[in-house]
Regions:
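Catalytic domains of cell-wall/extracellular-matrix polysaccharide-remodeling enzymes
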Residues: 91-169, 173
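Conserved hydrophobic/aromatic packing and binding residues within compact polymer-binding modules
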Residues: 288
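Short capping motifs at secondary-structure boundaries
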Residues: 234, 266-271, 291-297, 316
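Substrate-binding cleft of extracellular glycoside hydrolase catalytic domains
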Residues: 1-127
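Functionally critical loop-and-helix segments that line ligand-binding/catalytic clefts
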Residues: 1-11, 19, 148-231
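Acidic, Ser/Thr/Pro/Gly-enriched interdomain connector segments
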Residues: 10-12, 223-278
Length: 316
């Protein structure tokens, strides 16, 4: 495909004249969707609606403050909930997980990988394409590519000494990140300007990016002509009503047999490839979370009455 030049925007850009943005040759935008307090970005509604009206391709990003897998999951569920309810005719650039905040800097590479992978699991299970945004130094210091599943990277690496850079200017390729094999987008400046001022915020400056590859915004699902239900046995819930990760240490035979049934069901339902060992460990908990996401249940990794009901109704 031809390389595309796109911008990313948020409330900091304030009111944007999207007609002018399109007129000056911008190929699309990635729009901030939620804030730290989990409310929508104050300009999200206005920005995406203008893109839809004018036929400007767009996607969304979430600047994450997550330091746990659970937080990453719940935040990305919210992102997908918002997207599910709005018009997406020109939604072409998917969902991006922006991880660069200092709150994650003290976490291990393993924990950061778990957070990213959890976010990806939620987004893709909801039918959207997923990518990760971060800065070049953050990528080098905090990301272990061998532990992160994502193959779509959006990396920021800026020129030094540029206070303003014209939208039409061609960036110096020597600054392009070279150690990211799966580079999808390069953010090359935070000081981009159009031929005339097109926004009332951030001094009229924008982040400018080059999109190198096609990035379908939604996951293509296979069409099936006949739904199939599970023919195996379902587990019986324990007295407290759910299975949870903390019970992975249990050795009671009857409990392990029930968890084996659950693992067999998850292998059938979502292809989780779990070892049917009867232990409710981290992998089983993650598989339950994926199943809950597919069924649009609360994601907590606990297999309880609502999850069991969904399992009995589940078909593929």
């Amino acid at each position: 495909m031809t390389q595309r030049k796109i911008i990313d925007v948020s409330t900091y850009n304030d009111t944007i004249d999207w007609k002018k943005v399109k007129k000056y040759g911008c190929d699309g935008a990635i729009i901030k969707i939620i804030r730290k307090d989990l409310g929508k970005d104050k300009k999200f509604e206005e920005n995406y609606k203008k893109c839809e009206k004018l036929g400007i391709p767009w996607g969304v990003y979430n600047y994450t403050y997550a330091t746990t897998v659970a937080k990453a999951k719940s935040d990305m569920e919210l992102v997908c909930d918002i997207l599910d309810k709005i018009s997406k005719k020109h939604f072409k650039y998917g969902v991006w997980f922006d991880i660069e905040d200092k709150v994650q800097a003290g976490l291990s590479k393993v924990k950061i990988a778990e957070i990213i992978n959890a976010a990806q699991t939620v987004v893709e299970s909801r039918g959207y394409k997923f990518g990760v945004y971060t800065g070049m130094s953050y990528f080098s210091e905090h990301i272990d590519k061998n532990k992160v599943k994502c193959k779509n990277w959006w990396i920021a690496r800026y020129y030094k000494g540029y206070n303003r850079m014209a939208f039409k200017a061609t960036p110096n390729k020597s600054y392009k990140p070279t150690n990211v094999a799966d580079l999808m987008v390069w953010q090359y400046t935070s000081s981009g300007v159009f031929p005339a001022k097109v926004s009332t915020g951030n001094g009229g400056k924008f982040d400018l990016n080059i999109l190198y590859h096609d990035f379908p915004a939604t996951v293509q699902k296979e069409e099936t002509t006949k739904k199939v239900k599970y023919t195996g046995k379902f587990p019986k819930l324990p007295p407290r009503g759910y299975y949870a990760f903390l019970d992975g240490i249990t050795v009671l035979k009857n409990t392990r047999e029930e968890i084996e049934k659950l693992q067999k069901f998850l292998n059938w339902a979502i292809g989780s490839k779990l070892e049917t060992d009867g232990k409710y460990g981290e992998k089983t908990e993650d598989a339950v979370s994926i199943f809950q996401s597919k069924c649009k249940l609360k994601i907590d990794g606990k297999f309880g009455a609502k999850s069991l009901k969904a399992a009995k109704l589940f078909s593929k």
